[in-house]
Each structure stands twice: as structure tokens, then as C-alpha cells.
Design a protein with these regions (language model features):
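Non-catalytic terminal extensions of PLP-dependent enzymes
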Residues: 1-164
Length: 164
């Protein structure tokens, strides 16, 4: 599945990977404007912690499922990654706005989804409940997208949401 969509870096001679796999997202940015960072943040909308970004290879996502994950969880993760792939394709084929889509605006916290104003070209439902398993067991992220560089340099925001 992943080798035919995202691409996998570092497979063995038989095409298998070890306990982790590195998804190659480098070409996506050139084709669609979508980065590995956008995918990682969109995973939060699906209830997953963002994977390791750009290590050991820049422009990639390192996925490390553990032995303790159930088959249902692994199958659900595959469904999530397939759905995110479809969202990327919507940007690529022009059916989703390149500047205003579920990926570049992820994650979508509850306070944004339920706000009176919604200024996006996609629905609140697509932002918050993209697949049925999320509807059944939603984990809301507490904050919207944060500027990564600023967040790394100014680790503690003020209570008014501005970095000092």
C-alpha cells in the first residue's frame, strides 16, 4: 500500500521493512504544496500522535507501530493514511484549494470547528470527522496549527496566545 502511494525509503532486498518504515513525502511538496509536516498535523485530526518528522531523511515521516497495537488499530491507521492520500490527490487534481484545504490548516481543534464563523472551502465535518472511526471516538487536539520555528524558539506561549 504505502510503497505505491507515499513511497518507502530503505527497504530490504525483498521489499520488506523492519519495525519501522520511512514514508517518502519529498516529491509531494513539489507536486501539490503538501509537506510531511502537513500530513503529520492532519494525523492529529484522526487521533494519532504526529510521527517522527524528517529523521533520518529530510522530507519523510517515520512510522513505528509497536507490537502492542491491535489489528484493528493497524487497519484503522492504514485507512487513515489512505484517506489522507485521497486528500492529497484532491489538492493535486484541483478539487481542493491549494491554499485552503484540510491538510495545510490541520489540526482542527474543537474551538475552531464549533465557532460561529467557518471561513474554509471545506466542511467542518471533513475537518473534524473525516472517517467513521473518528466520529465514534474523537480525540480533540487542544491547539490549532502553530508556527514550528517560532514554537521551537519560544517554547512557552503566554496565556493570551502570543509568544514572548
Amino acid at each position: 500500500l504505502f510503497k505505491d502511494t507515499y513511497g518507502i525509503v530503505y527497504t530490504g532486498a525483498t521489499g520488506f521493512v523492519g519495525h519501522e518504515m520511512i514514508l517518502d513525502c519529498r516529491y509531494l511538496h513539489d507536486e501539490t504544496g503538501i509537506s510531511e509536516n502537513d500530513i503529520a498535523k492532519r494525523l492529529m485530526d484522526y487521533g494519532y500522535h504526529a510521527p517522527t518528522l524528517s529523521f533520518p531523511v529530510h522530507g519523510t515521516l517515520m512510522i513505528e507501530p509497536t507490537e502492542s497495537e491491535s489489528l484493528w488499530e493497524l487497519d484503522n491507521f492504514v485507512t487513515v493514511m489512505q484517506t489522507i492520500w485521497q486528500e492529497i490527490q484532491e489538492v493535486k487534481n484541483g478539487s481542493a484549494d491549494k491554499e485552503d484545504n484540510v491538510l495545510v490548516n490541520a489540526p482542527h481543534p474543537e474551538y475552531e470547528v464549533v465557532a460561529n464563523e467557518w471561513n474554509h472551502s471545506y466542511s467542518r465535518e471533513k475537518a473534524a470527522y473525516p472517517i467513521e472511526s473518528v466520529r465514534d471516538n474523537k480525540f480533540w487536539i487542544n491547539v490549532a496549527r502553530v508556527d514550528n520555528t517560532l514554537g521551537d524558539r519560544k517554547l512557552l506561549p503566554t496565556r493570551y496566545g502570543k509568544f514572548e
